[in-house]
Swiss-Prot record:
Gene: BAGE3
Superkingdom to which the source organism belongs: Eukaryota
Identification of the protein by name: B melanoma antigen 3
GO cellular component: extracellular region
Organism whose genome encodes this protein: Homo sapiens (Human)
Function: Unknown. Candidate gene encoding tumor antigens.
Length: 109
């Protein structure tokens, strides 16, 4: 997990640079924590309204975690620090979910 966290810190900075240079970049990484699980992560930049009162757009990005489920998990974020924290949390949550699934499978067999 530690290697994944360091990688996320670097990738968040790269993401911010890419979003500023290109109109609609899709930046993809494959995260492979030490426990052997892997996540394909795609960052997509979009323009979303900041609020109804302020008539201007701000760059944001959508994190799409491509898991084995039919529908990707999406989160709208605004800062690279939040990108890093969110991905770290999702990796932990996924690990917890897999642990529960393994325990359930062992109980039923």
């Amino acid at each position: 997990m530690a290697a994944g966290v360091v990688f996320l810190a670097l990738s968040a900075q790269l993401l911010q640079a890419r979003l500023m240079k290109e109109e609609s970049p899709v930046v993809s990484w494959r995260l492979e924590p030490e426990d052997g699980t892997a996540l394909d992560v795609h960052f997509v930049s979009t323009l979303e309204p900041l609020s109804n009162a302020v008539k201007r757009n701000v760059p944001r990005c959508i994190i799409i975690l491509v898991l084995q489920e039919p529908t990707p998990f999406r989160i709208s974020v605004t800062s690279s620090c939040f990108v890093q924290n969110t991905l770290t949390k999702l990796l932990k949550d996924r690990r917890k979910m897999q642990t529960v699934q393994c325990a359930t499978a062992q109980e039923t067999s």
